[in-house]
């Protein structure tokens, strides 16, 4: 029996593997569109993206979020209203300076994020605490002039799948509760997609510009680099004060409300591809697979027998569709069965059904799992239920494999040298004791040649006697470091 597909290329040369798989599986065309840092979602990739967004939208809608759509252009004076915020983005903003041949009186920014534009409109919409909490979200493109090397889906100048949520609250505590809800929503999203993660409170020097604090989700790529896949920000009153946004409070005084914001992006799809793939291509969780079952007829040369196989194929596909499965029949006559197997394995379709003359005569189906390539034969009458059972097994197996890979790439050590070797060797995320001082945190980044991700969230107590390896002071937290994208 064949074993599961190799992951040697996937792990040893991940950047090249990723470029290969998004092209071969017809997910995302990157590098040929004549603007650096911008790619094109191809039809199959767009379907994966849509399925992922259905998960995101479903969880947000079920927790009282309302979808909106704001303009792409933000006037310069709005973007500059919150000074700390614009300082964090100024070097990355795309500016529109002309309309036709005429220079504009006011420069317009291509949205880098929407805190300023949404807060501005909320000043008109929200007047009283009775309207709170208010939770908006939108799925839009954002633009940032990345000066680092761009990577498809991972580091882009146009982020095309930016889900940003923005909420307004009566008090600091209410906003804090919203942060907790947002974290639970994101945990549910990533758990549904079988993507493992750590949750960290970003250090003060790396929090979102204008936020009181930032909580972030990071996963680990096959090459050992950490990838930020989601962030949640407690904005305090920074933006409501900047816009003099006041509402009537319970005690009838006017005061600034409190806000949060949180976002995920194309990186969710990138991590879905990266975490689960292998050397044959994508491995898509059945719950978000655009096609859950591909049916491939293997037709003999004899015309009568060929007709029998094709008739039975149509019957089988109809039965599987009636069972509620997303089914596609690959009846391309110019492709050999082996080429079709390769094609659909690259696309990560969870289940392949093979139908030849034997299956047509015995009223059975030969079923192959994408994750392990194991084959089994089942009667057509039992196929719907059996495939659903197999898809549940596939998801369980994918979850455990991803969890195992992730767990092997977390190191907790008191040795700065061990942490450096771990991070420089791109083996994953290292945790070491930290005194809490920014100077030590920044020096740790230099010494291990990596980036501080933050401290574990929720906060984890540090055992007595642990000390910062740089200054020798008592440790107040574990600090996470890794190579990042």
Curated annotation (Swiss-Prot):
GO terms for biological process: prolyl-tRNA aminoacylation. It is found in: Cytoplasm. The keyword Coiled coil does not apply. It comes from the Archaea. GO terms for molecular function: ATP binding; proline-tRNA ligase activity. Pfam families: HGTP_anticodon (PF03129), ProRS-C_1 (PF09180), tRNA-synt_2b (PF00587). Its main location: cytoplasm. CDD domains: ProRS_anticodon_zinc (cd00862), ProRS_core_arch_euk (cd00778). Gene3D superfamilies: Anticodon-binding domain, Bira Bifunctional Protein, Domain 2, C-terminal domain of ProRS. Homodimer. Catalyzes the attachment of proline to tRNA(Pro) in a two-step reaction: proline is first activated by ATP to form Pro-AMP and then transferred to the acceptor end of tRNA(Pro). This is Proline--tRNA ligase.
């Amino acid at each position: 029996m064949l074993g599961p597909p190799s992951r040697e290329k996937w792990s040893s040369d991940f950047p090249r593997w990723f470029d290969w798989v998004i092209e071969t599986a017809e997910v995302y065309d990157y590098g040929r569109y004549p603007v650096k840092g911008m790619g094109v979602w191809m039809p199959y990739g767009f379907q994966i993206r849509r399925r992922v967004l259905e998960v995101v939208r479903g969880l947000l809608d079920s927790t009282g979020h309302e979808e909106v759509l704001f303009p792409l252009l933000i006037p310069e004076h709005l973007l500059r209203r919150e000074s700390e915020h614009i300082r964090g983005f100024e070097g990355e903003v795309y500016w529109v300076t002309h309309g036709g041949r005429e220079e504009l009186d006011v420069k317009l920014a291509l949205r880098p994020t929407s805190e300023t534009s949404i807060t501005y409109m909320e000043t008109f919409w929200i007047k009283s605490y009775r309207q709170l909490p208010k939770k908006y979200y939108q799925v839009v493109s954002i633009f940032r002039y990345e000066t680092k090397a761009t990577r498809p889906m991972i580091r882009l100048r146009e982020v095309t799948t930016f889900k940003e949520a923005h909420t307004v609250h009566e008090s600091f505590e209410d906003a804090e509760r919203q942060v907790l809800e947002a974290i639970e929503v994101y945990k549910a999203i990533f758990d549904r997609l079988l993507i493992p993660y750590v949750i960290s409170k970003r250090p003060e020097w790396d929090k979102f510009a204008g936020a009181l604090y930032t909580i972030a989700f990071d996963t680990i790529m096959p090459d050992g680099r950490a990838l930020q896949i989601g962030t949640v920000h407690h904005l305090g009153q920074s933006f409501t004060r900047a816009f003099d946004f006041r509402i009537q409070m319970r005690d009838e005084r006017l005061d600034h409300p409190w806000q949060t914001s949180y976002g995920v992006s194309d990186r969710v799809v990138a991590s879905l591809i990266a975490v689960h793939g292998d050397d044959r291509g994508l491995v898509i969780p059945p719950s978000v697979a655009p096609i859950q079952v591909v049916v491939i007829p293997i037709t003999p040369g004899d015309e009568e027998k060929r007709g029998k196989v094709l008739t039975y194929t149509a019957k089988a596909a109809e039965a599987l569709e009636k069972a509620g499965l997303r089914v596609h029949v690959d009846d391309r006559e110019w492709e050999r069965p082996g080429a079709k197997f390769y094609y659909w394995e690259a696309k990560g379709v969870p289940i392949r059904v093979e139908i030849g003359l034997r299956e047509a005569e015995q009223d059975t189906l030969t079923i192959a799992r994408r994750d392990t390539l194991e084959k089994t034969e089942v009667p057509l009458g039992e196929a719907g239920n059996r495939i659903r059972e197999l898809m549940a097994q596939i998801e369980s197996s994918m979850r455990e494999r991803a969890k195992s890979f992730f767990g092997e790439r977390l190191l907790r050590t008191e040795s700065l040298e061990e942490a450096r070797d771990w991070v420089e060797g791109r083996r994953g995320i290292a945790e070491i004791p930290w005194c809490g001082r920014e100077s030590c945190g920044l020096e740790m980044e230099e010494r291990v040649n990596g980036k501080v991700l933050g401290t574990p969230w929720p906060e984890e107590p540090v055992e007595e006697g642990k000390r910062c390896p740089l200054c020798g002071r008592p440790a107040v937290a574990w600090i996470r470091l890794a190579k990042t994208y």
